[in-house]
A protein has these predicted regions:
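Surface-exposed molecular-recognition determinants
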Residues: 1-227
Length: 227
């Protein structure tokens, strides 16, 4: 299965290409006209670590999309929260001289996308997370332990409980263990149905990125028409 995102401020995505200059801190402009909630930066020349800013873990930490490390205390974001016009780089990990980078910059759009967090309860009756829409695609990450990034979508798994996962940090084939990491896609969010560490360890913070299949409300907060 393939996924794609169209760059448009209306959908909350700006793609920014820049060349590092080795001078930190450095501000990089974006065109969202809104505060970013998720930023992914990739080195286009060397293909090394892929750094994530997520609003739930803040500007003092990062997560690596290509690795299973827990969140890292880092100066990558210069301990500076992004604004509606710029995000700030703090180290040569994302601003090495003459290295080309690509930054994917997202902001939440009501009824279309949600970038949040939840706390696991270690129970098969796990937390329910409100998004305001039925998900089409969800990526979840345990921030406090060595675990995979796990992706669920409504194309490979069409009925609840959903347990077919791909791992963003691994080239391994699809996993499917309904007794370990199942979730339900709901009309207004998703519910955790198992207690595996990838999605639901007790008292652990998880971050998620979620995009809509069917909005529960439109961008103005009004209920949408039934299909």
């Amino acid at each position: 299965v393939g996924w794609g995102w169209k760059e448009t401020a209306d959908a909350g995505l700006d793609i920014v290409s820049y060349t590092g200059n080795g001078s930190n801190p450095r501000n990089i402009s974006h065109n969202l006209s809104a505060i970013p909630h998720w930023i992914l930066i990739m080195d286009r020349d060397q293909g090394v670590d892929r750094f994530n800013y997520h609003q739930a873990i803040g500007n003092t930490h990062t997560l690596l999309l290509n690795a299973t490390n827990p969140k890292i205390d880092s100066d990558v974001w210069n301990d500076t929260t992004p604004t509606s016009s710029v995000f700030t780089l703090g180290t040569n990990d994302v601003n090495a001289n003459n290295v080309k980078y690509m930054a994917y910059v997202w902001t939440e759009k009501k009824g279309f996308s949600k970038f949040g967090s939840y706390k696991g309860n270690g129970n098969i009756d796990g937390p329910m997370i409100y998004t305001g829409f039925r998900p089409a695609w969800i990526m979840i990450r345990n921030t406090g332990a060595t675990e995979n990034w796990v992706l669920f979508d409504a194309k490979r798994d069409v009925f609840n409980e959903m347990s077919a996962i791909l791992r963003a940090d691994s080239a391994a084939a699809e996993g499917n263990q309904p007794d370990s990491y199942a979730i339900d896609f709901l009309s207004n969010g998703f519910k955790i149905r198992e207690d595996d560490g990838k999605i639901n360890s007790s008292n652990v913070e998880y971050v998620f990125m979620c995009f809509a299949e069917s909005p529960f409300v439109n961008s103005n907060g009004l209920p949408v028409n039934a299909r």
